[in-house]
Amino acid sequence: MNVKFKAHLFIFSLFFCYNLSAQEIVKGDFKNENPQSSYVPSFDMDATDKPVKNVILMIGDGMGLAHICSGMYANQGQLTITNLKTCGFVRTQSANKFTTDSAASGTAYSTGKKTKNGALGMDENNQVIPNLPEKLSGYGYISGIVTTDNLDGATPAAFFAHQPERGMSKEIWADLPNSKLTFFSAGSYELFEKQAPNVQKEIKKEFTIIEEPNDKAIKKSKKLGYLPTKSKTASVNENRGDFLPSTTQMAIDYLSSRSTNGFFLMVEGARIDKSAHSN
């Protein structure tokens, strides 16, 4: 069997197995007696001419096929992602490294351009690249981000900041007031309080900042920043609860109520990567 044929056989097998899991719940002797429910889309809008109004980009930070399979088997053979009809693969190499990082990959998603590892919203020559929220604002769309990482984490920062190095936390926070975000939620309020007084002041000029969901404050605000305490964005194993789904719903409701044109929302599950680093 030659190498080329082996490669084609592998790709065929991969897609065959994925399509099988997308159509049927995997059977087996599972130990988890309390699985999370999964969602099966209706696919009613497939192949229709109706224009897309809202776009939600969901990023599992550091997630690959091993994580999807592990999650599926740990959840009695079912996940929402494996209920989808199609899958795709991308090359993740950055402009200067074979192995990318969250800054370069986040920038690739937010701008459509490859860059060097560590760069946020900038190219290899440290020139600013417009991100999706900035581009979409010119067409009347509003944008938001939700993450279980800190706000200055590389993935969320790639959607609003322009800095040459991901470790420039103070500068990343200082970019927030001039961003095109209408909603953001990330960790944490404690981190926000550590920023320079002038940066806090500028952020509060642009955003209503809340530590807990507050209907009155939410209703009155023009732009909203939900910065919960650090424990709210911790690992699920550390009793995070339903923070991510409930905050995602909050973001959808908030953005929907403030734009008739539509919105873009990036949602990141950051703890996949953090757990994989320790595995």
Regions found by a protein language model. Give the residues of each.
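Sec/Tat signal peptide C-region and signal peptidase I cleavage site
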Residues: 18-22
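Phosphate/oxyanion-binding active-site loops and adjacent basic polyanion-contact surfaces
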Residues: 165, 240-248
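Bacterial N-terminal signal peptides
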Residues: 9-17
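Bacterial N-terminal signal peptides that target proteins for export
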Residues: 1-9
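Active-site His/acidic residue clusters
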Residues: 154-159, 231-235, 259-262, 266-279
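N-terminal catalytic scaffold of extracellular/periplasmic and nuclease hydrolases
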Residues: 23-193, 201-216, 223
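The substrate-binding groove and active-site-proximal loops of carbohydrate-active enzymes
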Residues: 120, 235-240
